[in-house]
Amino acid sequence: MEQKILAYLKEHEAEIFEDLKTLVLAEASTSDIDALAKVREKLVTLIKERTGEDCFVYEAENGHCPVRFQYGKGEEKILFIGHYDTVHLIGALKYYAERNELHGPGVYDMKGGLVSAIWTVKAYKDLGIDPGKRLEFIFNGDEETGSAESSEIICELAKDAKAALVCEPCTANGDLKTGRKGLVRFTVRVHGK
C-alpha cells in the first residue's frame, strides 16, 4: 500500500507544488487579520477541492479562526494539528522555486505540512483506502503568537483522540520531527537597589 500511495503522490507532484505555491503566496502574519482571512479562504477552498470534505470554521473574537475538517470513520480518532499563520510580515521573504524546492514564507513552517495533510486525504480517497479511523484536522491562525484563541478548541478536540500529531514537515534530510524545544515567556520584576 505504501508504494501505491508514493506512486500516486509522485504522479501528482506538480499539483502538490502548485497547491503549496498558492498557500505560500497568500501571505499572512498572525497580526494581519485581513490577510489571515484571505489565507483561510484559500485553505478552505483547497480542502474542499482536493478532498471533497466540508470545513467548519470556528468564530474567534480576534479573527484567528481555526478551520476543522475530517475524513474516515471508526471508533478511534487521530487529531492532526497545523497552522496557517506565519511569523514573517508580508513581503519579508520572497517566493521562488529552485530545482524541485520551493522557498518562501511558510513553506517550512507550516504550509508544507498543511498541503501534505490535504493530499494524504486526497490520496486515501482516490485510491479507495480506508484509514479505519476518524482523521480530524484542525488548522489555527494564531500559532506563531502562542495559540491564545485556539488552544481551548484544540484541547477539546484532543480529549477523545487516540493520538495527536502536528503536521510539521520533515527536516531537510527527510527525518520525522518527534519533538521540539518549546517556548516560555515570563516577566521578571526587580525591586530595590
Describe the residue ranges of each PLM region.
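Sparse, context-dependent recognition of short Cys/His-centered cofactor- or disulfide-binding micro-motifs
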Residues: 8-9, 24, 40, 54, ...
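Acidic/His- and Gly-rich active-site-bordering loop/insert found
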Residues: 2-107, 126, 131
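Fold-level recognition of mixed alpha/beta catalytic cores in primary-metabolism enzymes, strongest
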Residues: 98-99, 112, 116-119, 126-193
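Short, charge-rich amphipathic segments
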Residues: 1-5, 55, 83-88, 136-154
